[in-house]
UniProtKB/Swiss-Prot annotation:
Signal peptide feature range: none
Keywords tagged on the record: Cell membrane, Membrane, Transmembrane, Transmembrane helix
Protein name stated in the entry: Uncharacterized protein MG406
Listed transmembrane segments: 12-32, 39-59, 90-110, 113-133
A Gene Ontology term for the protein's cellular component: plasma membrane
Disruption outcome: Probably essential, it was not disrupted in a global transposon mutagenesis study.
The organism of origin for this protein: Mycoplasma genitalium (strain ATCC 33530 / DSM 19775 / NCTC 10195 / G37)
Membrane topology: Multi-pass membrane protein
Length: 158
């Protein structure tokens, strides 16, 4: 999977996720403005945004904080970070619970669930797509920087 210690790439992946989410939000807003009766879908789609921002910030900050620790402290902190890394996905349950509890006319539950699943699934897809692309480009760059060195095997006998 993707190495989240690379903050530059982690920021790019997070930005791609939010741009895709914003694109879908604009499409839903256009549909709501043209039809005028699906406001609950718009609110349902927007409900998980604060929780997704919190989750993305925790990914970026946890990786840099964990990388700054020394090896001895890393071994002690692994169990805590494993729990916290798993627990941050529980944050995504909060908007779904809110959409179930609040009157269905305000938040569309299906739109909330789809929007809630949008962030972690797109995060996983981009992480697994990014790794082969990064590997391909690193190999491409390293092949272009190689210089041909004659070893003597290619010379013909006189």
């Amino acid at each position: 999977m993707f190495n989240w210690n690379n903050r530059k790439v982690a920021k790019i992946i997070t930005l791609i996720i939010f741009v895709a989410w914003l694109f879908v939000l604009i499409l839903i807003a256009v549909v709501v403005l043209t039809k005028g009766n699906n406001l609950d879908i718009l609110f349902g789609w927007m409900l998980p945004l604060p929780f997704a921002v919190l989750n993305s910030l925790s990914v970026l900050r946890l990786a840099s904080f964990f990388a700054s620790l020394k090896n001895v402290k890393k071994q002690k902190a692994v169990s805590f970070f494993a729990f916290f890394f798993t627990a941050r996905y529980l944050i995504y349950l909060i908007p779904v619970i809110i959409s179930f509890v609040v009157t269905p006319s305000i938040f569309n539950t299906i739109a909330t669930i789809i929007s809630t699943l949008f962030f972690p699934i797109l995060n996983l897809v981009l992480s697994f797509v990014w790794l082969p692309l990064e590997y391909f480009f690193i190999n491409l760059i390293s092949k272009s920087k190689r210089k041909h060195v004659a070893t003597g095997d290619s010379f013909k006998r006189n």
